């Protein structure tokens, strides 16, 4: 779990997201509170509940981007799900408890990686021995092995092909629910894994080069050194105490006033979410998981519905409300120039792979921001995503002809932008800009 202060979390988010300080501060405080709670006495720790957040704002202003960046910062089990993917219990589809089961799988992956790093040195030594076995045989004399070991460490044998045996990894085959036992999701491969382990583990022979064999062998050796039961226990504990669930598109399951149709199913999903957000115990194949201290961050555009259309009980379980503002021309300009991986930097780097030197003047950046704002106001406001449409249109010809213009220098100015995008009023083919 991250130990960043709220100020550090906000400054980290500032590298990728322009504006929206209220939302950044809210998630920064919530993330820091996870760490603060861990410092308390055990008696008080159980009483401190996370303050769940509801982010409200139009599309394309940074709600989902905040969640993506938060996931990398958190250093804790984090899952982002769309509320629309779930159905009420009894209907065909995924029930909301699957969110927690998926979160536990993510937690296991995180803990496993951490444990692998702890035993990496030992695993590397084991991998080296296995490579030597493949090169000179297990019965070779110590002198021969030492001679090859020196060559191996010097990189002289990197391109030599060898046959190695590695443990079979599951290929993600689908699972099935056991009727009458929610949460007891058994994958087809889980069963074969059980039989494989009972017979000493399943392996497969792979032909590869010495250099590329190390990754598989180190992973293999690491897995032998770590205890899966410990990983599962730690993962469940990590999910219960530090887990974060980001519920996107929550406005799509709100009952719109006077709306007809699938209202019952929508309300059912909300009712199923209630115990999850409030605190319940979910059965998973790794044991029961309590959701009392999992942080839930919900977000939605609320274009056609409003937060008050959500069930009152669910509203009460999302006590912190943050409104994200629509983007202005100045915001668009900053998005193009100030963010760490801005679109302009991306396109300059992409064209540089073709030895094409691309440059944007200050007035070109102003023109791009201006066009994006005008298109958003006249067609459909899709926020910062509009910039991708505009940039793609402006650089359409350059991208196509780039391989034939290697070594050239191309300057993009406002005239070039206007010429290729055209004034909104004069442009008849508006469909190009509608995503």
Swiss-Prot record:
**Protein name according to UniProt:** ATP-dependent protease ATPase subunit HslU
Cite the InterPro entries for this sequence: AAA+_ATPase, ATP-dep_Clp_protease_ClpX, ATPase_AAA_core, Clp_ATPase_C, HslU, P-loop_NTPase
- A GO MF label: peptidase activity
Q: Carries keyword Cytoplasm?
A: yes
- What family does the entry list? Belongs to the ClpX chaperone family. HslU subfamily.
Any idea what job this protein has? ATPase subunit of a proteasome-like degradation complex; this subunit has chaperone activity. The binding of ATP and its subsequent hydrolysis by HslU are essential for unfolding of protein substrates subsequently hydrolyzed by HslV. HslU recognizes the N-terminal part of its protein substrates and unfolds these before they are guided to HslV for hydrolysis.
What Pfam families does UniProt report for this protein, alphabetically? AAA, AAA_2
Q: Keyword Chaperone: yes or no?
A: yes
**Domain of life of the organism encoding this protein:** Bacteria
User: Where is this chain primarily localised?
Assistant: cytoplasm
Tell me a GO biological process for this protein. Answer: protein unfolding
Subcellular location(s) per record: Cytoplasm
Q: What is the lineage of its organism?
A: Bacteria, Pseudomonadati, Pseudomonadota, Alphaproteobacteria, Hyphomicrobiales
Q: Which positions are annotated as binding ATP?
A: 18, 60-65, 248, 313, 385
* Keyword annotations of the record: ATP-binding, Chaperone, Cytoplasm, Nucleotide-binding, Stress response
Q: What is the name of the gene encoding this protein?
A: hslU
Q: Entry's Gene3D superfamilies?
A: 1.10.8.60, P-loop containing nucleotide triphosphate hydrolases
- What does the subunit section of this Swiss-Prot or TrEMBL entry state? A double ring-shaped homohexamer of HslV is capped on each side by a ring-shaped HslU homohexamer. The assembly of the HslU/HslV complex is dependent on binding of ATP.
Q: Which NCBIfam families match?
A: hslU (TIGR00390), PRK05201.1 (NF003544)
State the GO CC annotations: HslUV protease complex
């Amino acid at each position: 779990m991250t130990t960043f202060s709220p100020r550090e979390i906000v400054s980290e988010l500032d590298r990728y997201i322009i504006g929206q300080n209220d939302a950044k501060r809210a998630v920064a405080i919530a993330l820091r509170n996870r760490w603060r709670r861990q410092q308390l006495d055990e008696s008080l720790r159980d009483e401190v509940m996370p303050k769940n957040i509801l982010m409200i704002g139009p599309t394309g202003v940074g709600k989902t981007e905040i969640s993506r960046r938060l996931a990398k910062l958190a250093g804790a089990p984090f899952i982002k799900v769309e509320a629309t993917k779930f159905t009420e219990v009894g209907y065909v589809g995924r029930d909301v408890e699957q969110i927690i089961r998926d979160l536990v799988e993510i937690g296991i992956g995180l803990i496993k990686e951490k444990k692998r790093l702890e035993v990496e040195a030992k695993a590397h030594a084991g991998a080296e021995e296995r490579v030597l076995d493949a090169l000179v045989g297990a019965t070779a004399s110590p002198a021969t092995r030492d001679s090859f070991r020196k060559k191996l460490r010097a990189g002289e044998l990197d391109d030599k092909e060898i046959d190695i045996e590695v443990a079979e990894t599951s290929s993600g085959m689908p699972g099935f629910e056991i009727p009458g036992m929610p949460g007891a999701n058994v994958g087809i491969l889980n069963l074969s894994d059980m039989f494989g382990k009972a017979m000493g583990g399943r392996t497969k022979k792979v032909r590869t080069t010495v250099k590329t064999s190390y990754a598989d062998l180190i992973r293999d050796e690491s897995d032998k050194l770590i205890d899966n039961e410990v990983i599962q226990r730690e993962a469940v504990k990590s999910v219960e105490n530090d887990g974060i669930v980001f519920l996107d598109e929550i406005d799509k399951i709100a009952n719109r006033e006077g709306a007809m149709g699938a209202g019952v199913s929508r309300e059912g999903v909300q009712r199923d979410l209630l115990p999850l957000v409030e605190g319940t115990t979910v059965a998973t194949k790794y044991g029961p998981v309590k959701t009392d201290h999992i942080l839930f961050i919900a977000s939605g555009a609320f274009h056609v519905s409003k937060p008050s259309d959500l069930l009152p009980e669910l509203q009460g379980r999302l006590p912190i409300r943050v409104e994200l503002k629509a983007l202005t021309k100045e915001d668009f300009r900053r998005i193009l120039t100030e963010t760490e991986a801005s679109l302009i930097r991306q396109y300059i780097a992409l064209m540089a792979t073709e030895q094409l030197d691309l440059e944007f003047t200050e007035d070109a950046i102003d023109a791009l921001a201006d066009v994006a704002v005008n298109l958003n106001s006249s067609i459909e406001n899709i926020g910062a995503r509009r910039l991708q449409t505009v940039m793609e249109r402006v650089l359409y010809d350059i991208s196509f002809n780039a391989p034939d213009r290697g070594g050239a220098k191309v300057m993009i100015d406002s005239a070039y932008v206007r010429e290729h995008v055209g004034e909104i009023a004069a442009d008849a083919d508006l469909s190009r800009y509608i995503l």
